[in-house]
Amino acid sequence: MRKFNLFIAFVCAAIPLVGCRSTSPKPTEQDTIAIYQTVIKQIYQSDDTFGGTLEKPILYIVRATNDATGDPSLPRSSSVVLSETVQQNITNALSNLPTTIIWVDSFDQVSIDPNTGVVDDKGVIITLGNIQYENNDRALLSANIYVANLAAGGKTYVLEKKDGVWVITGTTGVEWIS
């Protein structure tokens, strides 16, 4: 009977702990800026669907997130608008790129040639997803680039924080290109 009482006491003590695992980590503002600017830079420099050779004098970045941008089949979080502070800090972090960064509210806000589907003024449009943390040092971020109707691509990037710096270590899931 004593063992049974001990067992019951253990179960009663453990019940409140069920489901009390920590929630998924939330990015700090600095992590948010670092992750987004790392992926934008990767798209600008090499993942532009032209092997990094495309001149991109204007980089339009959609300020509202869209998780379907990399892998449309994955579950989606609600869209959020990146804060002015985050946008400005991302722009500052990318100031060494030879492009003009323009933040837009939506894809439809960018002028596109109706006959060719090409973004006006040789620009490109980047759409970003929400940062999905797997733990404090590993995150996923969906993103895509649009140049024209048959020149676009998207994927989900895997990032890891190494020695305090967020780096892309690979991709996961569907990668698409048109």
PLM features per residue range, with description:
Residues 20-140, 144-152, 174-178:
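Flexible low-complexity loop/turn motifs enriched in small/helix-breaking residues
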Residues 1-8:
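Bacterial N-terminal signal peptides that target proteins for export
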